[in-house]
Swiss-Prot record:
Any single Gene Ontology cellular-component annotation: cytosol
Official protein name in the record: Glutamate 5-kinase
Binding site for ATP: K14, T173, D174
GO biological-process terms attached to the record: L-proline biosynthetic process
Reactions accelerated catalytically: L-glutamate + ATP = L-glutamyl 5-phosphate + ADP
Amino acid sequence: MRSIIADSKRLVVKVGSSLVTNDGKGLDHAAIGRWAAQIAALRAQGKEVVLVSSGAIAEGMQRLGWSKRPREIDELQAAAAVGQMGLAQVYESRFTEHGIRTAQILLTHADLADRERYLNARSTLLTLLRLGVVPIINENDTVVTDEIKFGDNDTLGALVANLIEGDALIILTDQSGLFTADPRKDPAATLVAEANAGAPELEAMAGGAGSSLGRGGMLTKILAAKRAAHSGANTVIASGREPDVLVRLAGGEAIGTQLIARTARMAARKQWMADHLQVRGHVVIDAGAVEKLTAGGKSLLPIGVTDVQGAFARGEVIACVGPDGREVARGLTNYSSAETKLIHRKPSGEIESVLGYMLEPELIHRDNLVLV
């Protein structure tokens, strides 16, 4: 089996905290130097690379003399602010040794949820790549809140892959890849060499959480691969402990788990809707509506809605949940939650008699609806 990275030109590489720190006690300068050298080798092959790097909070903890990761958000943000300075400096120094300039970009979900800022971020990243710069991206932990944070850099890496229409996302971790079960508990567990991104059985295999230093377990990596597939990006989950792992992947060696994007690439606007707009509420839909959305490519009509949950305004994103509780789609609603509660289970022809007006016959038009 040949590595999918060999034929990929535009890469997003995500490096976890454990691979750039001394067991959480500050940055591992030598390790960062090795990552810079490998990325320089990829650049020499004509590949474009965007790096998503953890490590700011761990470095901040070291500089502040803290041995345990704080729980209070203000202390985490303070550690991130202190540590981000050191992280950027070390990367700049190590890449300069190879004649490569770097750029620091800090993002929040709010940056990408706003369409204009999303397009600006995309334009900036593409310009940096055109100029031969390696963008180094992290979540802006200093200002982020629970409502607008990505939650982990695996998710951020996937969103960046979507943003720049990357060919592949490489998630480097301290694990060898995805196993059929937890290899620490099940001696019969085997490595999943290749699978389809988004295959439902992968989430069951992924299981538990990550370490206390980082925020991402294997499940977040599987979900990140599913998200990256929205734009057609394949994903590799591999051990960053493997010597020259990036160079070997680029050379065609199959390492870790390859998750292939089999689904059709989403249109850019729908991809943005699916990835970056915050869900404000939910509607439960019947089996007939699920069938029409998933197989028929139809709009969601009020008659197919059986329940309305949460408070949302017209034009906000709501999730469509089937009778089994699984989300099947999300989209921009034409009616508020208060209006939807009045018109759900009713034919579109009765909307005007119930509300006194009819904005649209659909609750969500198919052009504003994305299957998930």
